[in-house]
Amino acid sequence: MSAFTRRTLLTASAGAAALALSSCGLAGGKDEGPTEKDGVTTIVVGASPKPHAEILQFVQDELAQEAGLSLKITQYTDYQIPNQALNDGDLDANFYQTPNFLEQQEKEKGYEFHGFEGIHVEPMGLYSDSLASLDEVPDGAKAAIANDPANTGRGLALFEAAGLITLKEGVDVISATPADIAENPKNIEFTTLEAAQIARSLGDVDLGAVNGNYALEAGKSPKDDSLFLEPGEDSPYGNMLVVREADKDNEALVKLNELLHSDEVKAFIEETYSDGSVIPAF
C-alpha cells in the first residue's frame, strides 16, 4: 500500500471551520487510502464535532490500537466540505451523514461513495427561544429549516409529524420543499438556512428544525429542550461511516466500521448520551 506524502486541510468557507483534533499533520496523499507503517494503519476521518468526533475519539482511545489502527480525526462544522474532502482524497472516510443526505449529494455532485450500516441516530427536533409549546405557535410564525435538500425534506416531514403542516400526497420527502406543502393552517413562513446556523438563529424565528448534533453543539438537550422530537426507533436517518466506492472493501476501513458497531461503542453512546439525544442504530 503506497504511503501518502501529504494531507491538506480544506479551508472552510462561509463561516465553516475545520479543526484538526490531532496536533500532528495529516498523513497521506490523494486518493490512495489509509497509510500503513510499522503494522499500524492510519485513517484520516472527517467528522462533525458532536457526537461523531467524540465517538471516533473513544474508538481511538479504547479500541484502535488493539485493532492495528490509528485515527486522525478532523472536525467540520459544515455539511458540504467533508464529502468534498473525501472525494478529493483529503480524507479516507467521513462520519457525519445520513443515507438520505448521501443519496442527495451523490445525485447533485456525482460522488461515488459507499455508506456502511447506520451507527447512531440523532433525532431532529423543533426548537424555539420564544415558545414553550407547539400550542403557542402563532399565525404567520416564522420557521427555519435546513437549506440542503435532504434536510429540507426531513425538516418539513418533522413539521408534518408535529401536526403543523401537511405535505402533498405522494411527495418524496427526500426532495420535498415548501412548495410541496398542501395544508398550512398556521400560515407558517419557512426560511432556509445552513443547517449549522439554525440553532444560533432561533432568536430571529419562532421555531426551527435543528439536527441533533447541532442542538448538542448549541448546548441544548433534544429530550428536554425540544418542542417536538423526531422518533428514534426504526429511523431511516442512521449516521454512518462513508468511504469512496473504490475503498469499500479496504481492510482497515472495514475494520473501523466494525469497531463503530462494537458493543463497546454501543455502551459508550448509551452512557454518554443518556438523555436520548444520540441513540445506537444497531
Task: Report each predicted region and the residues it spans.
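Short, polar/charged alpha-helical segment
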Residues: P49-K72, I81
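A bilobed periplasmic-binding-protein/Venus flytrap-type ligand-binding module shared by bacterial periplasmic
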Residues: P123-L134, Y237-N250
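N-terminal export leaders
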Residues: R6-L10
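Short, well-ordered beta-strand elements
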Residues: D38-K50, L69-Q75, K142-A143
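Short helix-initiation/N-cap motifs at beta->coil->alpha
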Residues: I73-Q84, D172-R200
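Bacterial lipoprotein signal-peptidase II cleavage site
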Residues: C24-T35
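A conserved helix-loop-strand patch within extracytoplasmic ligand-binding domains
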Residues: F116-I165, K266-A267
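Periplasmic-binding protein-like
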Residues: G153-E160, L260-P280
